[in-house]
Amino acid sequence: MLIFSVLMYLGLLLAGASALPNGLSPRNNAFCAGFGLSCKWECWCTAHGTGNELRYATAAGCGDHLSKSYYDARAGHCLFSDDLRNQFYSHCSSLNNNMSCRSLSKRTIQDSATDTVDLGAELHRDDPPPTASDIGKRGKRPRPVMCQCVDTTNGGVRLDAVTRAACSIDSFIDGYYTEKDGFCRAKYSWDLFTSGQFYQACLRYSHAGTNCQPDPQYE
């Protein structure tokens, strides 16, 4: 009788596991459900031309920014409970990017409830030569600079949405975006333009270049 009860219990467990959507384990399914998700789609922003994944841009359009979505910091991808590909594509496209997606019907989502994405740390990786440093030099006194993100593959067309996003990084404590001319300015912390950090933000969001000029507002 005891053996029969054990076998029956195991059978119920197996039946319950097979009924879980998307092939998720009970623990992972409960984890996704905790975010209001059934984990059906996984999408991320990619750069034009290269197809490189852009974690910075992906994180900016996921989680708190998109209902019923969760940012998987391990993968750098956005998970959807519903088919939100059109909405997420609009986000990627607004930053001059493409989008890639795949179905999660056969993928087991790893638990990553404690994962966090350090967007600031990404800005310091592979820092390029400062693109605005020459502009920012004026004897011993630094010269105020303003910058904007531009599409270097399309004649330097300014990318307002990318500039706005790059201007909102935590490093720019007093940074602000001006709608009139599409530049990012900072009254005091504009040295981040000359150090290459703003360039990195444009790069992380959209593989964009920068256009930097002296800021006459603070001359």
From Swiss-Prot:
Main location: secreted
CDD domains: KP6_alpha, KP6_beta
GO cellular component term, pick one: extracellular region
Glycosylation sites: 98
Propeptide: 20-27, 106-138
Region (Disordered): 120-142
GO terms for MF: toxin activity
Signal sequence annotation: 1-19
Cystine connections: 32-39, 43-101, 45-92, 62-78
Keywords noted in UniProt: Cleavage on pair of basic residues, Disulfide bond, Glycoprotein, Secreted, Signal, Toxin
Subcellular location field: Secreted
Note: The KP6 toxin polypeptides interact with the cell independently, as monomers.
Function: This protein is lethal to sensitive cells of the same or related species. The KP6 alpha subunit is known to recognize some cellular receptors before interaction of the complex with KP6 beta, precipitating cell death.
Complexes and interactors: Heterodimer of two small polypeptides that are not covalently linked.
Protein name per Swiss-Prot or TrEMBL: KP6 killer toxin
Organism: Ustilago maydis P6 virus
Organism classification: Viruses, Riboviria, Orthornavirae, Duplornaviricota, Chrymotiviricetes
